[in-house]
Amino acid sequence: MSESDNCFSSSSILLDGTTSVALFSFSPGYRDVSTSVIQSSKQAMKRPNMNQEKAIQTSCNLNSSVVRS
Protein backbone atom coordinates (compact mmCIF):
# COMPACT_ATOMS: atom_id res chain seq x y z
CA MET A 1 0.00 0.00 0.00
CA SER A 2 1.46 3.34 -1.02
CA GLU A 3 1.49 6.48 1.10
CA SER A 4 -1.08 8.06 -1.17
CA ASP A 5 -3.46 5.19 -0.39
CA ASN A 6 -2.92 5.78 3.31
CA CYS A 7 -3.52 9.46 2.75
CA PHE A 8 -6.77 8.81 0.92
CA SER A 9 -7.99 6.52 3.70
CA SER A 10 -7.30 9.04 6.44
CA SER A 11 -8.82 11.86 4.37
CA SER A 12 -12.02 9.94 3.76
CA ILE A 13 -12.59 9.69 7.52
CA LEU A 14 -13.23 13.44 7.52
CA LEU A 15 -15.62 13.17 4.60
CA ASP A 16 -17.52 10.07 5.71
CA GLY A 17 -16.54 8.61 9.07
CA THR A 18 -18.75 5.53 8.99
CA THR A 19 -17.50 4.38 5.59
CA SER A 20 -13.88 4.76 6.60
CA VAL A 21 -14.31 2.90 9.86
CA ALA A 22 -15.91 0.04 7.96
CA LEU A 23 -13.08 -0.04 5.42
CA PHE A 24 -10.44 0.04 8.11
CA SER A 25 -12.02 -2.75 10.12
CA PHE A 26 -11.53 -5.10 7.17
CA SER A 27 -7.78 -4.44 7.36
CA PRO A 28 -6.54 -6.00 10.63
CA GLY A 29 -3.17 -4.25 10.51
CA TYR A 30 -4.82 -0.87 10.26
CA ARG A 31 -7.14 -1.02 13.25
CA ASP A 32 -4.82 0.90 15.59
CA VAL A 33 -3.90 3.37 12.87
CA SER A 34 -7.51 4.10 12.03
CA THR A 35 -8.37 4.69 15.68
CA SER A 36 -5.64 7.28 16.13
CA VAL A 37 -6.42 8.97 12.83
CA ILE A 38 -10.13 9.15 13.63
CA GLN A 39 -9.36 10.72 17.01
CA SER A 40 -7.00 13.32 15.55
CA SER A 41 -9.43 14.09 12.74
CA LYS A 42 -12.28 14.68 15.16
CA GLN A 43 -10.07 16.95 17.27
CA ALA A 44 -8.89 18.85 14.20
CA MET A 45 -12.41 19.41 12.90
CA LYS A 46 -13.50 20.82 16.27
CA ARG A 47 -11.08 23.72 15.86
CA PRO A 48 -12.84 26.58 14.07
CA ASN A 49 -9.54 28.06 12.88
CA MET A 50 -8.48 24.86 11.12
CA ASN A 51 -10.05 24.32 7.73
CA GLN A 52 -10.84 20.89 6.31
CA GLU A 53 -7.83 20.77 4.00
CA LYS A 54 -5.44 21.37 6.88
CA ALA A 55 -7.19 18.74 8.98
CA ILE A 56 -6.91 16.23 6.14
CA GLN A 57 -3.20 16.97 5.74
CA THR A 58 -2.66 16.49 9.48
CA SER A 59 -4.36 13.09 9.33
CA CYS A 60 -2.34 12.17 6.25
CA ASN A 61 0.93 12.89 7.99
CA LEU A 62 -0.07 10.98 11.11
CA ASN A 63 -1.26 7.97 9.17
CA SER A 64 1.83 7.80 6.94
CA SER A 65 4.24 8.10 9.85
CA VAL A 66 2.50 5.36 11.83
CA VAL A 67 2.47 3.04 8.82
CA ARG A 68 6.17 3.69 8.14
CA SER A 69 7.28 2.89 11.67
Swiss-Prot record:
Top-level taxon: Eukaryota
Record's miscellaneous remark: Completely overlaps YOR186W.
Protein name: Putative uncharacterized protein YOR186C-A
Organism: Saccharomyces cerevisiae (strain ATCC 204508 / S288c)
